Amino acid sequence: MLRSKLPAGFVVPAQPVQRAAPPSGADWVHEIKHDAYRIIVRRDGERVRLFSRKAIDWTARLPAIAEGAGRLKAKSFTLDGEAVVVGPNGLTDFEALRRRGSGDVAVLYAFDLLEYDDSDLRRMPLETRKTTLASLLS
């Protein structure tokens, strides 16, 4: 998608890069990769929109996530995360996410806070963003 065609407020998420071996050392953070859809959640005032990593509006497809984001106590933010359906065994279930039947509710596993109350946080250290994210979600 051309940048000029991106929706207002959309932030292009960072993409993982495959390596032969994971990095090691105290400066690295490792995240679990779930069977999920990558989602950018953008709230601006009362309006909440969910986007796929390719900037497709998924708000209507994931209403529980949009409703939950609307209840957070912030006037604006952009979250990066993964929409998942957790099965009865506690594991993410990608097929349930794809079909989302009447009993399958998608939830967001948020792992980064890119913008918060009109401030771009992407240049801040990841640890700081994660601390702010935890505060927003609590």
Model-derived regions, located:
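Catalytic cores of nucleic-acid ligases and guanylyltransferases
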Residues: 1-138
